[in-house]
UniProtKB/Swiss-Prot annotation:
This is Ribosome-recycling factor. One of its GO terms (cellular component) is cytoplasm. It comes from the Bacteria. Responsible for the release of ribosomes from messenger RNA at the termination of protein biosynthesis. May increase the efficiency of translation by recycling ribosomes from one round of translation to another. InterPro entries: Ribosome_recyc_fac (IPR002661), Ribosome_recyc_fac_dom (IPR023584), RRF_sf (IPR036191). HAMAP family: RRF. It comes from Christiangramia forsetii (strain DSM 17595 / CGMCC 1.15422 / KT0803) (Gramella forsetii). It is found in: Cytoplasm.
Length: 183
């Protein structure tokens, strides 16, 4: 029985990781509003090494269409601008001598559809991850030295777990798509 619980717990952990990864990936997909997470991939040259932007500056959103970046050291302003340009996010940073300001342009309908497709692809990847965890759990259950009744009920449990996680992925995707398509 312990072996079965271990297999189920392992499958659940893997599925949870797929959900976590999906959320992280979706947070990088930009919806209409400005958010500090949009700059999560920006690296800045800081004393000779590449450093994440969040470690060298505060990123704020004064309003829904603007990102304000306050560097901890004013000498970093040009490096921050360069980092944003190199990250290829489609932003045009401006500096006022003390901070870097980014006006986030509104998304076009075509771009919204592209982002929606990207979100669907990420969700599908997460579903594949969940299904792979199910497959692995099923194989391990078959290898386990357990009765047929226990095997059947355990397989049903794994399938139920899989269905639950697939539903969660669909809900997360629906929320993100709504966020993307909202003008």
């Amino acid at each position: 029985m312990d072996e079965v619980e271990f297999i189920l717990e392992e499958a659940k952990e893997g599925m949870e990781k797929a959900i976590t990864h999906l959320k992280k990936q979706l947070s990088n997909i930009r919806a209409g509003k400005a958010s500090p997470s949009m700059l999560g991939s920006v690296m800045v040259e800081y004393y000779g090494s590449q450093t994440p932007l969040q470690q060298v500056a505060n990123v704020n959103t004064p309003d829904a269409r603007t990102l304000s970046i306050q560097p901890f050291e004013k000498s970093l302003i040009t490096e921050i601008e360069r980092g944003i340009m190199l990250a290829n996010l489609g932003f045009n940073p401006m500096n006022n001598g003390e901070s870097v300001i980014i006006n986030v342009p509104p998304l076009t309908e075509e771009r919204r559809k592209q982002l929606s497709k990207q979100a669907k692809a990420e969700a599908e990847d997460a579903k594949v991850g969940v299904r792979n965890d199910r497959k692995q759990a099923m194989q391990e259950l078959k290898k386990a030295d357990i009765s047929e009744d226990l095997l059947k009920s355990s397989e049903d449990e794994v399938q139920e777990l899989t269905n639950t996680y697939i539903e969660r992925i669909d809900k997360i995707l629906t929320v993100k798509e709504t966020e993307i398509m909202t003008v």
